[in-house]
């Protein structure tokens, strides 16, 4: 289900502070490491690189214009598909 329109998009406060610090040139422009997969991508994030945790490792996500409005977790898959079970000795 979609979030109610009367509510603002969710962004973790600590993540937003890191983004604002980079945009104001208070800290060097390097990837922002985050565990907050549920944070919504704002237009301010365009051009920044986030390292989003997928449960095992951090996945680099470079934010482009098309990603605005989506969640950070959508771009860091948590599951790997290894194929359906097949009889390997059947060949």
From Swiss-Prot:
Domain of life of the native organism: Bacteria
A Pfam family matched in the record: Ribosomal_S19
SUPFAM superfamilies, alphabetized: Ribosomal protein S19
Single GO cellular component term: cytoplasm
Disulfide feature: none
GO molecular function annotations of the record: rRNA binding; structural constituent of ribosome
Keywords: Ribonucleoprotein, Ribosomal protein, RNA-binding, rRNA-binding
Classification via PROSITE patterns: RIBOSOMAL_S19
UniProt record, GO biological process: ribosomal small subunit assembly; translation
Family membership noted in the UniProt record: Belongs to the universal ribosomal protein uS19 family.
Function: Protein S19 forms a complex with S13 that binds strongly to the 16S ribosomal RNA.
HAMAP family per record: Ribosomal_uS19
NCBIfam families in the record: rpsS_bact (TIGR01050)
Protein name: Small ribosomal subunit protein uS19
Organism: Metamycoplasma arthritidis (strain 158L3-1) (Mycoplasma arthritidis)
Lineage of source species: Bacteria, Bacillati, Mycoplasmatota, Mycoplasmoidales, Metamycoplasmataceae
